[in-house]
Amino acid sequence: MRTKLTLVGAGPGDPDLITLKGIKAIRSADVILYDALVSPELLEYNDCAIKVFVGKRAGKHSKKQSEINDMIIYYAFKYGHVVRLKGGDPFVFAHGKEELDYAESFGIDTSVVPGISSFQLPGLYSYPLTHRGISQSFTVVTATGSDGKISEDLQNSISSKSTLVILMGMRKLSGIMQLFKNADRKDLPVAIIINGSLPDAQVISGRVRDIEEKLNAEPTLNGPGIIVAGESLSTHSDYQRVLKSWLKTA
């Protein structure tokens, strides 16, 4: 029996945003180990496979990473083809490489199917990460370092002209906005995307100075979110409407 591990990026949530190659991998799996943010609809592509939930979300882990690694080995040698179905992309703020290396150390064949990462969600709502004459680059950064504090990479990016896409930062939103204010960037456009790509997705746009107030005015908001900050957002229709309204009253 051939043993194999395929890491599959399930995308940001909408089941239609998985790749065709990802669907083919799911259909060929003997066992599927899937994350919390994976759409249940994706599991329906394979009625015969063993399906095991190993999700992690908001600090609540059903399994430790070491346990997941061992489960990959166990199921591969017992059944054959294991698909590790991971939210977003397996190699973007995930343990994809760790799982891949661990499987290979046991002589298991491996392959990777990339997925759409949540950092690409701004485009789904017409927020450009780059724009000619405004922003020539974008930076994707996690909000939290290994010490639980705001990451050093994020702190070093606050003054950059690059558009910032901040993942796993909702719990530190106030501290992050204060960093921008300390850098005299209170007017910088900011957008928050919660449950991006899902039917209940909510998008809040504002600026550093008022984004927290706008967020607090929406008490029903719940779910994983990303923070986007940069001048390129000013080209979005939300900001253009505000600008035109301001010009009329000025």
Language model segments and positions:
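Class I SAM-dependent methyltransferase SAM-binding "motif I" and its flanking Rossmann-like core
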Residues: 89-160, 202-205
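Short hydrophobic alpha-helical segments that form membrane-spanning helices or hydrophobic packing faces
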Residues: 20, 121-125, 176-177
